[in-house]
Regions:
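Cleavable N-terminal export/targeting peptides
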Residues: 1-31
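Short glycine/proline- and aromatic-enriched beta-strand/turn motifs that initiate or cap beta-hairpins
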Residues: 25-63
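Repeated loop/turn-to-beta-strand initiation elements of outer-membrane beta-barrel proteins
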Residues: 29-30, 47-51, 69-77, 99-105, ...
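Membrane-embedded beta-strands that build the outer-membrane beta-barrel scaffold
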Residues: 42-44, 51-53, 64, 95, ...
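Acidic, glycine-rich flexible loop segments
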Residues: 107, 115-121
């Protein structure tokens, strides 16, 4: 019981730290994602750079996302991730197709030594929020909420 309480408090404290970090660094977005495999992430981003922290482990990732194509109907971006604790860099090309009220996307993560997960999903923007529902090839469903500033 105490362990569960401490875990909830730790996640709440991490959320407040991320909010403080986001507001103090003038971030453009802050997000929270949880997955059916038990993983959860807090992220903040500014001008193509993103910092993501996995809340159930000490795991951090830095990302630079370069948009190669950004049109009214399509966005093709090429994020370069660096996973700090694993000392591993990966690429994760993403293609988004924009419709009137939502966007469909597909992405594939890999590096030179390893073929990693593919993921598919839907982004639904509502005012300053974006809701994401997705699935990846490890049979995990993901849900994400992002607030734009």
């Amino acid at each position: 019981m105490i362990f569960v309480y401490n875990l909830k408090m730790r996640n709440l404290i991490l959320l407040f730290i991320a909010l403080f970090f986001a507001t103090s660094t003038y971030s453009q977005k802050i997000g929270y994602e949880f997955r059916t495999n038990g993983k959860a992430y807090i992220s903040t981003s500014y001008a193509g750079f993103e910092v993501r922290h996995r809340t159930d482990k000490e795991e951090n990732r830095f990302t630079y996302r370069y948009k190669m194509l950004d049109s009214e109907k399509f966005t093709f971006s090429l994020p370069l991730h660096y996973k700090v604790e694993k000392e591993k860099a990966t690429l994760e090309p993403r293609l988004k197709y924009h419709l009137n009220k939502f966007s469909l996307w597909a992405q594939k993560e890999f590096n030179l030594e390893e073929n990693m997960n593919a993921a598919f999903g839907i982004d639904i923007p509502v005012n300053d929020f974006t809701y994401r529902i997705g699935w990846d090839s490890s049979d995990t469903v993901r849900f994400r909420l992002v607030k734009k500033f």
